[in-house]
UniProtKB/Swiss-Prot annotation:
The lineage of its organism: Bacteria, Bacillati, Actinomycetota, Actinomycetes, Mycobacteriales. InterPro entries: KOW, Rib_uL2_dom2, Ribosomal_uL24, Ribosomal_uL24_CS, Ribosomal_uL24_KOW, Translation_prot_SH3-like_sf. The keyword Transcription regulation does not apply. The gene is rplX. It comes from the Bacteria. This is Large ribosomal subunit protein uL24. Keywords: Ribonucleoprotein, Ribosomal protein, RNA-binding, rRNA-binding. One of its GO terms (cellular component) is ribosome.
């Protein structure tokens, strides 16, 4: 999966199309990412007591994961780009590059 935690992405399809956000969690086994402020859902939680005796519960709004195919990585110029790889000459490791301008991500 070419999108990692901490990347800034643009949502390219779905109900939040056009939204930008930071990747909070990447789930490579499920091909999903959790993006800040995108795909907000209302979760109904049961009431439970905390150690101070305050009741917590009700309807909580939180982000839900979306498919990685619905997001595009933003390059250093803030434009959506596809991701490529190249070998680093010094370390020999793969480095992600932006296909739009060829710069490292």
């Amino acid at each position: 999966m070419k999108v990692r935690k901490g990347d800034t992405v643009l949502v390219i399809s779905g109900k939040d199309k056009g939204a930008k956000g930071k990747v909070l969690v990447a789930y490579p086994d499920r091909n999903k990412v959790l993006v800040e402020g995108v795909n907000r859902i209302k979760k109904h939680t049961a009431e439970s007591r905390t150690e101070r005796g305050a009741a917590s519960g009700g309807i909580v709004t939180q982000e839900a994961p979306i498919s990685v195919s619905n997001v595009m990585l933003l390059d250093s110029d803030g434009k959506p780009t596809r991701v490529g790889y190249r070998k680093d000459d010094e370390t020999g490791k793969n480095v992600r590059i932006a296909k739009s301008n060829g710069k490292d991500l």
